Regions:
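Alpha-helical DNA-recognition elements
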Residues: 232-233, 285-286, 297
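Short, conserved beta-strand element in jelly-roll/cupin
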Residues: 57-73
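Short hydrophobic/aromatic patch on the recognition helix
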Residues: 226, 230, 278-279, 283
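Short, basic-rich loop-to-helix N-cap that marks the start of a DNA-contacting helix
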Residues: 240
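Short acidic (Asp/Glu) patches
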Residues: 47-52, 69-71, 91-94
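N-terminal low-complexity or simple alpha-helical regulatory segments
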Residues: 1-61
Length: 299
């Protein structure tokens, strides 16, 4: 299992998804990640030392199933609060959002082969509410397969047998979808489209000086609706989400900088930031270190 003391470095190691991540509070400054290919399926197990506001897209050829581990209720996927039977189903090419506010948490995922009919390319992601017993069987099997080095997958027969067990349990989860008990806010397709438009705009110009009114206009909604959508999707206001994205953009630049040639002031200036003291205070509150600490530690 890979261990990281930096959230962004951990995020860059996550496989099979194009992610925009923002750390939301740290309980324990440690993030861990493990992967395992089992025949035609790809397993992933993640432990995060704090909260995470995530928007991403599935890069696998087949459907990706994401499931929270531990006690439910703290994880929100596609604006729906997760329970013991929640499975986030992400077809190939589909995007999704996940929020966990200000707490350490864990999750696992399984990428199915493209031949498994679990979601067509271009279809939207959605939260499936399956039998909790089947979901527990699947998460336990994934956790054991990834965490147990004694499982020898070099043997084709062992790998094939485990792959078939994983696919059988995953198929059992997909076969039953019960009505969700908790739905936050407005219809999820509309909300996801609003989130998608804002994230796309921020991807194009993460350090731009757009106002919240500008972003609402870009998404085709009112300021009030934009606020409700971001509260449902990420648990924060649009302004706070934009601030977090800006902080992480600068952090990545500092991590990739050369302390022999760069200074914090130059990096910030390249990102249109001139109020160095104010920004440094926000940066320290978010990451627990100063911008110069990041530049010199990563250099």
């Amino acid at each position: 299992m890979l261990t990281f003391d930096d959230f962004d470095a951990w995020g860059e190691a996550v496989r099979g998804a194009d992610l925009r991540l923002a750390c939301d509070g740290v309980e324990t400054p440690q993030w861990r990640l493990a992967f395992r290919n089992v025949g035609a399926v790809v397993l992933q197990l993640g432990y995060e030392g704090g909260g995470n506001l995530c928007f991403g897209g599935n890069n696998h050829q087949g459907t990706l199933l994401w499931m929270p581990l531990g006690e439910p209720g703290h994880q929100v996927a596609n604006c729906e609060r997760c329970d013991h039977g929640s499975v986030l189903v992400i077809p190939p090419g589909a995007d999704f959002c996940i929020q966990v506010r200000k707490r350490a948490h864990a999750w696992c995922s399984i990428a199915l082969p493209g031949t498994i009919p679990a979601g067509d390319r271009g279809a939207a992601s959605h939260v499936l509410h399956a039998d909790p017993l089947n979901v527990r069987r699947l998460t336990s099997l994934i956790t054991r397969a990834v965490s147990a080095p004694e499982v020898d997958l070099a043997s084709p027969s062992v790998a094939e047998g485990l792959s078939q067990r994983l696919l059988a349990v995953a198929s059992a989860c997909l076969a039953q979808d019960v009505e969700p008990e908790t739905t936050l806010g407005r219809p999820k397709i509309e909300r996801m489209e609003v989130v998608r438009r804002i994230v796309t705009a921020l991807d194009a110009d993460p350090m731009g000086g757009r106002s919240i009114a500008d972003l609402a206009t870009e998404a085709g909604v009112t300021n009030r609706t934009l606020g409700r959508v971001f509260s449902d999707a990420f648990g924060v206001s649009p302004r706070r989400y934009v601030q977090l994205r800006r902080l992480h953009t600068v952090r990545r630049a500092l991590r990739g900088g050369d302390p022999h040639d760069d200074t914090v002031a130059r990096v910030l200036a390249r990102h249109g930031i001139w109020e160095l003291g104010r920004f440094a205070g926000s940066y320290r509150r978010q990451f627990g270190e100063s911008p110069s600490d990041t530049l010199y530690r990563r250099g």
